[in-house]
Every structure is written in C-alpha cells, then in structure tokens.
C-alpha cells in the first residue's frame, strides 16, 4: 500500500503520479529563490497538507533550515496526531493555524469519524509552550453553524487565550471551490444544493461576533 508501483505499470496510463519525492536541500533551493521577498515583506514559508504532521520530522528539518535563514515559518494543521509532534514543531514554527471543525466532540466524531480530544490536547500543550496560534473554523450550513457550535468554539478560544498566545479565531464560510477536485477524482460532491452563504448572512454573522471581547475574523471569499 502506498508503494506507487501501480502507476509505473498501468498499461493505459490512467494513473499519474501527482508530485514527487524531494529532499530538504532541494526544497530550500526553491525557497531561497524568493528569499529577498520574504525578508523585505515579512512573509515566509507555510507547510500545509493533507495533514502535515504525518511528516513531522521532515517538516521540522525543513523549517529549521528556514529559521537559520531568518525566514518566518507557519503550519496549517488539524492537530489530530500525537502531542509529541507538536512539541517538536513548536521549536521551529512561528505561527500555527489550527482547525477546529466542531467544538462538541460527539458531533465531531459523528461528522469526521474521530472526536476532537487530540485537537484540544494539542492546542492546550501549544499554549503551555508559548506558541503563536490562530484557530480556524470552517463553517458549513447544517453541520456546524448552529448557535451552540459557533459560540462554543469562540468561548473555547477565549478561554485558551487566557492560558497562552491564542491570537484570534478565523471563521471560514463554506464555498464550492473544491467541487472540481471531486470531479477530477470521479467522486460525488456531498453538498449539492448549497451555493454558500449570502453576503447578507455574512453581514449578520459579523454583527453577531461584535458582542465578544475577542478578535474574530470572518474570511470572505
């Protein structure tokens, strides 16, 4: 499983390798092409996924090289893997962007197959380590956009911010940008009849967020 030999021997060329194996030094050569821009703009390197913490050792090695060159580092993660991964990452990551898809662990398990205990554990450990963290909550109609789900996530973020450097929570309203990926993979798109939130609905959400003494950023697409 995962050996990719099927792609090499596929008679009809129906399977293609999307991506390639690279070393840390090869990636650094690519990163350094934009070094002047990173330094002048304050930008940097963000590792995402899939789930980047499944390759923690490689990510740490790459980000350590970035730090040697004074390049800002960030990771996007669901924070569902072992806490030891995040203890390693905290040594080389300037900014964690961490998803909370549902604050209620029972609902989280019903929707995604696992609870959110690891997410909470890793967030709390990062707070203790002094890491800079932004929580991100994808908002999907009928799944996690109830009053209890939204306020629960915000209240949890506010409580964490008193424990460490949790900077804000980003709310990411559902959109259909991923539909083409499903088509390319010949998969059925699971949300067929929801075009996303209207501008008026987003305006009401922003007005609702103003009652909280905490930075909540609604990301409009």
Where are these regions (language model features)?
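Cysteine-centered iron-sulfur cluster-binding motifs in ferredoxin-type domains/subunits
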Residues: 1-13, 51
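Conserved beta-strand termini and adjacent loop/short-helix elements that scaffold enzyme active sites
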Residues: 18, 172, 219-221
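Iron-sulfur (Fe-S) cluster-binding segments and ferredoxin-like electron-carrier domains
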Residues: 13-19
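A cross-taxonomic marker for long C-terminal extensions/tails that follow the last structured domain
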Residues: 200-221
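A charged helix-plus-loop insertion that forms the helical arch/lid used to bind
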Residues: 185-195
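Active-site anion-handling motifs in enzyme catalytic cores
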Residues: 22
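Conserved AdoMet/S-adenosylmethionine-binding subsite of the radical SAM
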Residues: 25-28, 32-177, 183
């Amino acid at each position: 499983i995962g050996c990719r030999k099927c792609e090499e021997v596929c008679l009809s060329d129906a399977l293609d390798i999307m991506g390639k194996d690279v070393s840390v030094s090869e990636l650094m050569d690519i990163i350094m092409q934009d070094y002047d821009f990173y330094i002048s703009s304050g930008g940097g390197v963000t590792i995402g996924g899939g789930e980047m913490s499944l390759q923690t050792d490689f990510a740490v090695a790459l980000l350590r090289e970035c730090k040697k060159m004074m390049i800002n580092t960030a990771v996007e993660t669901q924070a569902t893997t072992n806490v030891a991964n995040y203890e390693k990452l905290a040594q080389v990551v300037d900014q964690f962007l961490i998803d909370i898809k549902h604050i209620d662990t029972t609902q989280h398990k019903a929707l995604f197959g696992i609870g959110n205990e690891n997410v909470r554990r890793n967030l709390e450990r990062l707070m203790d380590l002094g890491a800079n963290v932004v929580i991100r909550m994808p908002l999907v109609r009928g799944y996690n956009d109830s009053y209890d789900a939204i306020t629960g996530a915000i209240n949890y973020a506010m409580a964490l911010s008193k424990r460490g450097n949790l900077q804000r929570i980003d709310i990411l309203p559902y959109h259909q940008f991923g539909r083409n990926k499903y088509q390319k993979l010949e998969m059925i798109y699971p949300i067929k009849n929801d075009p996303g939130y209207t501008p008026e609905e987003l305006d009401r959400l922003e007005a609702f967020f103003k009652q909280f003494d905490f930075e909540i950023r609604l990301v409009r697409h």
